[in-house]
Amino acid sequence: MNQERVFKVLLGPHISEKATGLADGKSQFVFKVATDATKLEIKKAVESLFSVKVQRVTTLNVKGKTKRTARGLGKRNDWKKAYIALQPGQDLDFATSAE
């Protein structure tokens, strides 16, 4: 997998209360990923970008909410979320892996 596709697959970390609890307790991390990305692509992208071993990848599609505005109804974009479980003994550090 080339470096350009790695950055198109992983859009960024998803920060929430649940994601923070999973990262602290179970060594699982949550990412926003491209909607056309497969589990194998996500696994390879995380392993190459952060130099860790991935145990499991679980994905889900999040449907965009319908919102009311002054101009009528609007819809937020659909997006895909990936839960990344690392092998025991592995840890993901966002600060040093970006270098």
UniProtKB/Swiss-Prot annotation:
GO biological process: translation
Swiss-Prot/TrEMBL keywords: Ribonucleoprotein, Ribosomal protein, RNA-binding, rRNA-binding
Source taxon at top rank: Bacteria
GO CC list: ribonucleoprotein complex; ribosome
Single GO term (MF): structural constituent of ribosome
Pfam families reported for this sequence: Ribosomal_L23
InterPro entries per record: Nucleotide-bd_a/b_plait_sf (IPR012677), Ribosomal_uL23-like (IPR013025), Ribosomal_uL23/eL15/eS24_sf (IPR012678)
Ribosomal protein is among the record's keywords: yes
Family matches, as NCBIfam families: PRK05738.1-3, PRK05738.2-4
Family membership: Belongs to the universal ribosomal protein uL23 family.
Quaternary structure, from the entry: Part of the 50S ribosomal subunit. Contacts protein L29, and trigger factor when it is bound to the ribosome.
Function: One of the early assembly proteins it binds 23S rRNA. One of the proteins that surrounds the polypeptide exit tunnel on the outside of the ribosome. Forms the main docking site for trigger factor binding to the ribosome.
Name under which the protein is recorded: Large ribosomal subunit protein uL23
Lineage of the organism: Bacteria, Pseudomonadati, Pseudomonadota, Gammaproteobacteria, Pseudomonadales
